[in-house]
Amino acid sequence: MVPNLMVIKKHLIGLLLILCPLSLQAQPLFSVVDIQGIRENQLVGYGLVVGLSGTGDKSQTKFTSQSVKNMLSQFGVQLPANVNPKLKNVAAVAVNATLPALASKGQSLDITVSSIGDAKSLRGGTLLLTPLKGADGQIYAIAQGNLVVGGVVAQGNSGSGITINIPTAGLIPNGGIIEREVTSSFLTASTVVLNLKKPGFNTARNIEKEINELFGPDVALAQSHARIHVRAPHDPSQRVTFLAMLENLDIETGPRPARVVFNARTGTIVVGKNVKVHTAAVSHGNLTVSVMESFNVSQPNAFGRGNTAVTPETDVSIDQERGKVFIWPDSDEGTSLQTIVDAVNSLGATPNDLMAILIALDEAGALDGELVVL
């Protein structure tokens, strides 16, 4: 069956009653799913920023000069083929924007502009009219306007200078205008497809159950742990009302995965609440190798015929810290996250030490969780 407007009105009060007794772990439906056909699209273009105060691209940036010559030729200005103008006030830039879902012609977009060449700063510049294309090569928007640059660069004649933030990138608020709309099957398809942001069989089953309890049997059908098909009204106004009711529906999500995430570049470690550790003895010590090298000068006496020589002297020492041994207590459910944190702090371990300990625990089979290294 396909729900109509009368059914939606009939069950509106029932929806409010259903939402009240849900547990605190329930989340709004649209916070756990994406609607297929309602998505953002990325746009990109190539343009020129003019009006810079001598901080533009240098003469060795050939594509900037070529771009200016091509632009001038469109206005009837022809330069000799062997002439490469010096353009300190112009910079070649990449222009990008995000096209919102179901956006209409005439709406404005925020524009991001980034330098491509060797320009020092885009502060004070103006982006000339630039078409923005999608992945299919079609023009969906145009951009133009004055840049807002948060970075500052200052340099003296001696070559010394100072740079604050990033002066080679800027924004143009509402600097783009949508010229073409993206066609979507959302408004014409007989079903609405819900894609789970974090796939899970329990969550997919709960979504199917809650929607069918509200609108009737066979309205929602879970195709997999990541996709649910929902029959929706064909009339656009009824479909909007139908989705508004789905938006207010709370869903109990499945259990969160037990996961430890380690960023090797920054040393950041995030340990999920459901990570458990079983009985294990842990000892972690640091081994430090120091190599000190000094140079001695061998100077012969004044009447000798020897030569002055430089002799290196190397001193190698090894220092091994005594590592403490800690035994995590065990229980039927494993050691909690707080106990893990307290134990690591008592050992005085750094983030890298902690990651080494967790990897060793996982290899020993004492860690209930997934290790993810970024």
Swiss-Prot record:
Q: Which GO terms describe its biological process?
A: bacterial-type flagellum-dependent cell motility
The keyword Isomerase appears for this protein:
no
Q: Where in the cell is it found?
A: Periplasm; Bacterial flagellum basal body
Q: Which domain of life is it from?
A: Bacteria
One cellular component (GO) term of this entry: outer membrane-bounded periplasmic space
Q: Which cysteines are joined by disulfide bonds?
A: none
Say if the entry is tagged with keyword Signal: yes
Query: Which segment of the chain is annotated as a signal peptide?
Result: 1-26
- UniProt entry keywords in alphabetical sequence: Bacterial flagellum, Periplasm, Signal
Q: Which GO terms describe its molecular function?
A: structural molecule activity
Q: What's one Pfam family the UniProt record gives for this protein?
A: FlgI
Subunit (UniProt): The basal body constitutes a major portion of the flagellar organelle and consists of four rings (L,P,S, and M) mounted on a central rod.
Which HAMAP family does this chain map to?
A: FlgI
Q: Which NCBIfam families does UniProt cross-reference here?
A: PRK05303.1 (NF003676)
Matches recorded under PANTHER family: FLAGELLAR P-RING PERIPLASMIC PROTEIN FLGI, FLAGELLAR P-RING PROTEIN
This chain's function reads: Assembles around the rod to form the L-ring and probably protects the motor/basal body from shearing forces during rotation.
Family that this chain belongs to:
Belongs to the FlgI family.
Which named protein is this?
Flagellar P-ring protein 1
